[in-house]
Amino acid sequence: MADYTTIAAQPRNEFGKGFARRLRVAGQVPGVIYGVDVEAPIHFSINRLELHAVLRAHGVNAIIELDIEGEKHLTMIKHVDQNVLTLNADHVDLLAIKRGEKVEVEVPVVLTGETAPGTTLVQDADVVLVEADVLSIPEEITFSVEGLDVDSKVLAGDLAMPANTSLVADAETVIASVNHEEVAEEAEETEGEDAEEAPAAEGEE
């Protein structure tokens, strides 16, 4: 992620649920910038469609240069509150960053390929904690499971780190494991039986 987007934002001097609601109705998302070198949190509002476009293009670790009335702030998305019904962003927290610094972030792990016949792949961890140059945060880390047989495990230490990125997570952290297909089916059946028995038990009470 060597590139970043510059987005114009407006300073925000009013607070409270009512004001935030009016901003959202107007297509804006309230947010705040914080960081070690930020003396006081900087409150702003940003166009929702522009924010969503950045999230779609660069993911949850997106870098944004925020232009607030001509003053530019290089930031990284730290947290986005989503509306549970519309899935629109309701609020965004941005971390002030500097070019050249390193940050710890969780990066999605994408497994590719097919394991050996008669096996099933269980992904135990969807993300892995790494340290990366703030302007070179990988959008994802891929690992091929092609041909892996039963009892094979993919550990965090097995993942190839992109340039300017190092592993922070314990190298022994299990990312994925390969099981017999029958074991996976039995586990699913057990879960289904437990789900059926729970309502029956409640009815007996």
From Swiss-Prot:
An MF annotation (GO) of this entry: structural constituent of ribosome
Superkingdom classification of source: Bacteria
Compositionally biased residues, Acidic residues: 183-205
Signal peptide bounds: none
Biological-process GO terms, alphabetical: translation
Entry's Gene Ontology cellular component terms: cytosolic large ribosomal subunit
The entry's keywords: Ribonucleoprotein, Ribosomal protein, RNA-binding, rRNA-binding
Disulfide cross-links: none
Ranges for region Disordered: 180-205
CDD domains listed in its UniProt record: Ribosomal_L25_TL5_CTC
Stored HAMAP family: Ribosomal_bL25_CTC
Subunit organization: Part of the 50S ribosomal subunit; part of the 5S rRNA/L5/L18/L25 subcomplex. Contacts the 5S rRNA. Binds to the 5S rRNA independently of L5 and L18.
Physiological role: This is one of the proteins that binds to the 5S RNA in the ribosome where it forms part of the central protuberance.
Family: Belongs to the bacterial ribosomal protein bL25 family. CTC subfamily.
Protein name: Large ribosomal subunit protein bL25
Organism: Corynebacterium diphtheriae (strain ATCC 700971 / NCTC 13129 / Biotype gravis)
